[in-house]
Amino acid sequence: MAGWDLFGWFRDILSSLGLWNKHGKLLFLGLDNAGKTTLLHMLKNDRLATLQPTWHPTSEELAIGNIKFTTFDLGGHLQARRLWKDYFPEVNGIVFLVDAADPERFNEARIELDALFQIKELDNVPFAVLGNKIDSPSAVSETELRAALGLMNTTGYTKIEGQRPIELFMCSVVMKSGYSEAFKWLSEYI
């Protein structure tokens, strides 16, 4: 679709939902090499860049439509995962990326995701789980990823009182597809 403006689309959607001029704190989490920094860079600059692994937490101010987000890219290597808990206070949403083309690491991703689900402080925080790299020939299907991560019964677009909002979105950051739906979904909870 030539000339399609992703950011204009976000602005229009958020305006229609009454989410103009809101502010939220988002954490970008997931294992190393899942695409967290690439996604953040794409959202901020609308282009790809050659990136190195994230060794230290980085913070960016990001506006999608009229919602301003303070985003934290915390890195996914083992040492960085120990710091994730330091960023939980006052978080409004978590974007958890999984490399859908690396099934050998699904169990590790599930362990980290399940550990996050057990943290009382995050009980009401929405989780947008992104199965990234669907452009890769080795990427698994959404059904396979849901099963591997234990996400067969997510909340979808239904707000259920007393239940944490969780949804899985399949995407390709490099192809600029799939992740906009995740941010639209997250915006309904901020």
Swiss-Prot record:
Matching NCBIfam families: small_GTP (TIGR00231)
Keywords of the record: Cytoplasmic vesicle, Endoplasmic reticulum, ER-Golgi transport, Golgi apparatus, GTP-binding, Hydrolase, Membrane, Nucleotide-binding, Protein transport, Transport
Gene3D superfamilies: P-loop containing nucleotide triphosphate hydrolases
Function: Small GTPase component of the coat protein complex II (COPII) which promotes the formation of transport vesicles from the endoplasmic reticulum (ER). The coat has two main functions, the physical deformation of the endoplasmic reticulum membrane into vesicles and the selection of cargo molecules. SAR1 controls the coat assembly in a stepwise manner. Activated SAR1-GTP binds to membranes first and recruits the SEC23/24 complex. These SEC23/24-SAR1 prebudding intermediates are then collected by the SEC13/31 complex as subunits polymerize to form coated transport vesicles.
UniProt entry tagged with the keyword Phosphoprotein: no
Residues binding GTP, per UniProt: 30-37, 73-76, 132-135
Membrane topology: Peripheral membrane protein
Native source species: Kluyveromyces lactis (strain ATCC 8585 / CBS 2359 / DSM 70799 / NBRC 1267 / NRRL Y-1140 / WM37) (Yeast)
UniProt subcellular location: Cytoplasmic vesicle, COPII-coated vesicle membrane; Endoplasmic reticulum membrane; Golgi apparatus membrane
Full protein name: Small COPII coat GTPase SAR1
PANTHER family, per database record: RE74312P
Stored SUPFAM superfamilies: P-loop containing nucleoside triphosphate hydrolases
InterPro entries per the UniProt record, alphabetical: P-loop_NTPase, Small_GTP-bd, Small_GTPase_ARF/SAR, Small_GTPase_SAR1
Record bears the keyword Signal: no
GO molecular function per UniProt: GTP binding; GTPase activity
GO BP: intracellular protein transport; vesicle-mediated transport
Taxonomy of the source species: Eukaryota, Fungi, Dikarya, Ascomycota, Saccharomycotina
